[in-house]
From Swiss-Prot:
InterPro entries: Aminoacid_DH-like_N_sf, Malic_enzyme_CS, Malic_N_dom, Malic_N_dom_sf, Malic_NAD-bd, Malic_OxRdtase, NAD(P)-bd_dom_sf. Changing residue 255 to I: Increases Km for malate 10-fold, and Km for NADP 15-fold. Decreases kcat 200-fold. Residues 1-62 form a transit peptide. This is NADP-dependent malic enzyme, chloroplastic. Belongs to the malic enzymes family. The keyword ATP-binding does not apply. The keyword Chloroplast applies. The active site is at 184 (proton donor), 255 (proton acceptor). It is an enzyme of class 1 (oxidoreductase). It comes from Zea mays. Pathway: Photosynthesis; C4 acid pathway. Its main location: plastid.
Amino acid sequence: MLSTRTAAVAASASPASPWKLGGRSEGGASCDGCRTYRNTLRRRAAPAKVRALPPRRVDAVAMVSNAETETEKEQEEAAAASEELPVMPWATSVASGYTLLRDPHHNKGLAFTEEERDGHYLRGLLPPAVLSQELQIKKFMNTLRQYQTPLQRYIAMMNLQETDERLFYKLLIDNVVELLPFVYTPTVGEACQKYGSIFGRPQGLYVSLKDKGKVLEVLRNWPHRNIQVICVTDGERILGLGDLGCQGMGIPVGKLALYTALGGVDPSVCLPITIDVGTNNEFLLNDEFYIGLRQKRATGEEYDELIEEFMSAVKQFYGEKVLIQFEDFANHNAFDLLEKYSKSHLVFNDDIQGTASVVLAGLLAALKMVGGTLAEQTYLFLGAGEAGTGIAELIALEISKQTNAPIEECRKKVWLVDSKGLIVDSRKGSLQPFKKPWAHEHEPLKTLYDAVQSIKPTVLIGTSGVGRTFTKEIIEAMSSFNERPIIFSLSNPTSHSECTAEQAYTWSQGRSIFASGSPFAPVEYEGKTFVPGQSNNAYIFPGLGLGLVISGAVRVHEDMLLAASKALADQATQDNFEKGSIFPPFTSIRKISAHIAAAVAGKAYELGLATRLPPPSDLVKYAENCMYTPVYRNYR
């Protein structure tokens, strides 16, 4: 369940015991042998002895209650060592002492008080100093800034997440603008490329072809039962970097870290998953450190059967209200999966729907600067994949709702260019299904420049994944027939961006309204400083996810995406516009996410898709109260 602010305050005032349930949540199912084994341990645990001893002697209780078996265990282990037989990996049932310091959910580093150190057998296991959470954040930031490369900072942050979860999230929330590029894009792309080399402690859950027929058992191995948000990838299209196979795990791990830090979703209800069906990346297949299956990527029936088993197992094990976010699937699977499961599961594709929602928000905000409506603009895209067609469809949908015109007519305002040129009606026979709605009557054009000159768009959007394709002549052409050309260079990472912020402002003589997918530094042009907006999906998906969770939504509806876009656009202020930015600053992202969550939840209640009844009277306040707050708790 989501923590509430009230509960967080109560928790900080009322000490709690750092329970550790043997590596599995108490409700977790397992094989008959394991259940028998745990039941035997419970029978030996002698409740009367537990009540007879002081509360702080929990570890002593465990030792007393199992004293009768200690010699037996030692004999078994000695025999196993000599005979090379398997041994039972014994673990304490309460996080205390050495174990507590290595439990990321309960570890507080040097913030354990003197009383906690005595009560939980930490005396001598820590240096004498007691440092507050705030001071530990200051210390870690000082260390982080001394690293020379973004990847070093990424590794340090991931190590912190695996050792002190609350410090990790507090650090990220308090320094979100500085740390976001290291936790997610663009650094996460390099991390995925080198994931095998930097792999330490495993994060998330791996489902592979080896698990076919046993996916439900794999899900049961995860220690938490109350999962509400899953981010899953098959690693075939990681950012703009292509097929990284099993090493794509960095994406769902990073994505869910942002669900928590930016959207306030409790980390214990989040589950990152990678589905490993092989890879066609020859470099990885020949890399001795590659962590995935060493085989070509499965396709067709074999692939579909594993995905179907996975989706069925998730719904069976976690219920209908668990959000499944598809992440970085290749085009040929992404659209099919979204269409197939959107009617039976709570599913969301960030590459298609999340990108579209944040770009639509940027356009709505940009129109506040230039005037006019969505229907009065002409849109030209470079790139016709998941992102490009997803954005185009949401724009057409919003135009349709604003004008009451058929969506087929509204699509005619939007033009797309792919690797073969302008998508036109004469190409329909060779087009992929998701491109066909955008094939309009026009003469064939081979280049983006020709398309710009012919169509004369007011909005130019790049989702091609190919860097430096918005050339000087293209931006100058855009500026020649638009007083304020709107230019979105959305491809990630930075090296793949269609143009830089400096190029957009310089080549348009400071007149363009610019946004990018990757962050760019402020640009000075003729005495004015422009702060480029980052059209980052992280503006949308954390708040969207929170809204779905707090309302108990059972399906994602397109109207929820439109509501999220409008809520984000409303957060941009005149002060942002004067600096050239169409997005609000990330420093207020939790406030932004609360408003987006409220808008999404409100739409869920309006559409009859919410199950948490009755609806709260103040959805914004309710969303804020439901947000996870990563402050250290006191332990009794």
